[in-house]
């Protein structure tokens, strides 16, 4: 990976951390922006940027609607794992959240696009998703699960459709100095991924160090062998 790019990106984030919070109020809603860099962009156990650093930027809007909270967002980052993608991924998503005591439900839809992809079936991948997070009051932990349903028929490996639905179980724990996360996810016909992370905010920038273990889920997986990664990411919300 290009260490100069990583160091430069982290330095830029530290500079941004000195900026005032730029949250924009729009009626009862709010608009925020984020920027960051991943030392490697790993998505469900698969390297998305050929072992290179992946800078990213995004924007999120949220607004209360009755008893629900509506959110809309867009994100783009460096990506070089889709033929002809041109080094970029652009995602759009929308959903609603609702809390009942310690339980928060999140239902939404995400569209992941690769503008330069050479064939239609890999230009866009869309998914419905549902998430549940349990955060008991005054407790240092949360428990969560998520389920993503493919809405574009996956993509083809030779003549066979692969990459179906995805489900994940996760838990977080607040250790005080750092936050911990453990997750296990299965991407049907692709990967089974275990992630262990610790996170820490330093002068307004959130840093996350992760160990990721990805196993092939069948012979058609685009992961040619089981893989392990250690990644560092930094993200600033402003």
Task: Mark where each language-model region is.
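Outer-membrane beta-barrel proteins
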Residues: 2-9, 13-238
């Amino acid at each position: 990976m290009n260490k100069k790019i990583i160091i430069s990106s982290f330095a830029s984030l530290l500079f941004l951390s000195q900026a005032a919070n730029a949250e924009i109020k729009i009626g009862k809603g709010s608009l925020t922006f984020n920027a960051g860099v991943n030392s490697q962009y790993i998505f469900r156990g698969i390297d998305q940027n050929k072992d290179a650093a992946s800078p990213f930027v995004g924007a999120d809007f949220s607004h209360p609607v009755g008893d629900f909270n509506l959110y809309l967002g867009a994100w783009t980052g460096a990506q070089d794992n889709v033929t002809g993608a041109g080094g970029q991924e652009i995602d759009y998503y929308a959903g609603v959240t609702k809390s009942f005591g310690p339980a928060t439900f999140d239902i939404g839809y995400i569209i992941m696009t690769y503008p330069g992809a050479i064939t239609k079936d890999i230009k866009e991948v869309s998914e419905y998703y549902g998430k549940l997070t349990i955060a008991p009051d005054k407790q240092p932990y949360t428990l969560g699960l998520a389920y993503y349903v493919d809405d574009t028929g996956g993509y083809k490996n030779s003549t066979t459709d692969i990459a179906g639905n995805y489900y994940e179980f996760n838990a977080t724990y607040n250790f005080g100095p750092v936050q911990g996360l453990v997750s296990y996810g299965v991407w049907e016909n692709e990967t089974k991924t275990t992630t262990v992370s610790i996170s820490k905010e330093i002068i307004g920038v959130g840093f996350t160090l992760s160990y990721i273990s990805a196993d092939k889920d069948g012979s058609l997986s685009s992961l040619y062998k089981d893989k392990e990664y250690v990644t560092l990411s930094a993200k600033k919300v402003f």
